[in-house]
Amino acid sequence: MGLDSVHQRQALKYRLRAMVREGQLTVDGRNFYGIPSNTGLIKGRIVGHSNGSGVLTPDEGTEDIFLPRKEMEGVFDGDTGLVRILRRDRRNRPEGGLIEVLQHNTETILGRLYFDKSTWMLKSVNPRITQKIIVSQSGLEKEGLIVRAKITRQPSFESMATCRVEELLGHSVSTDIKIAESLRNNEIPELFSKEALSSTAKLENQIMSSDFRGALRAYPFITIDGADAKDFDDAIYCEQDSDHGWRLLVAIADVAHYVPEDSPVDKNAFERGTSVYFPGKVIPMLPISLSNGLCSLKPGEDRLVLVCDIRISKVGTITDYKFYEGMICSTERLTYDQASNGFIAKPWGESLSSAKNLVAKLLVRRKKRGALDFETPEPDLNFDADGRISAVGQKTRNDAMQLIEECMLCANVCAARFIDELKLKGLYRVHERPDEKKMFGLRKFLSSLNVTLPEGLPSPIDLQGALNQLNKKLNGQVLQLAILRSLSQAKYDLRNAGHYGLNISMYTHFTSPIRRYTDFVTHRLIKSVIQS
């Protein structure tokens, strides 16, 4: 190009960088510049790995794209970027080059100070962030100390990130500090607004006479949850009818009665989206006075509910349903172990016995339908007084857990049918059919284990057959993760595309409005129809 002087080359470098910032050019990790094109560029979230490499998880839900260590030098875990697929490996997995960082999402960082030659550096305690970070201060003389620092310059391919220490935390990190850091990194607000707390403080701790809905108070409803549960948003009652079928009542806390749309509490709940659970600590979606108080279906206390009243045939099919507002007084709060053991002599014993008979029929039908059933063990973590993991066990899944899952599934299916039949603009829980390329790779992997999968796009019944074969093998529960990873990710959508994993034509979330905003949205939709 005839650039003979250092000054000319430096000027060109600055000009090229400016053109990249303005979107006129793109540049990759090898400093190759090109004309921007939307063709082949994939937007998504960067996920770091402890070995320095990473992946881009595309916003569109397609397969992850591997990013080598060099491509990760200019980004942190959690950043948003544009990637172009450069090649595929022998297993047809894509490898990409980072074209542009669209958004840096790390503003503060928790790390350990160390001295490298003549410079203070920070090593993140987050194993997904492996990049070197320069500390801008001098004279700290605190090697090995854990600190909280503010990122003052984000990483790039030309320079390392820099930070400024804001808080000295000691030589070890407490659980409270880790939780606070996680909340900060994921932008999860811990405190509710003054307006939200003020509006909930005005609510009475008991049902107002004007809200009285007495028709269901005589029914022996029960809640069944984990032993450590604090908020009870669902209760059930079941009876056998004269046709040898069942009537199942699923009563869900009527959160929408207390939280008007666009109110301060509603805005705070929308920001959170869900309740967030940490060891020994919960960040609730709703203020505690609602989530653990007025909306929680505590035994012996009148509570407003939205009821899904379901008729189920003797062969386990839903024949009819209706939604209505009600009020219940829960008879008993049971743990899963208590419900599994059963107390037939109790006032609610007959209802629980009927529910168990119903669920036995539902499980038979579920198996015939071909719904996927992953037998992945759930870890049971025990913590010491300092909040550190002291032991790891395995939770046992008993029949009471299945009972509640199937009852809630019935209510969710009915809610989806309600939305569909009335052509409402509601949120469906969609699980689309798997990608054919992923199925091709899965079929090759299963074949190496002598597990067969039919050609073409397999049905859920086909995949369940493969799961059953894997579970008979050594480390079968680990091997079945290959099938899980080959499936599409479930999502919320205004368009109903069915639920592949459950093998049903429509599904939504209705049963957890205390801790999940999408369920809250479904409640509002159903109540708007009931009240009109």
Where do the model's predicted regions map?
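Charged, low-complexity terminal tails
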Residues: M1-I133
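Conserved, carboxylate-rich catalytic/transport cores that coordinate ions
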Residues: H104-S532
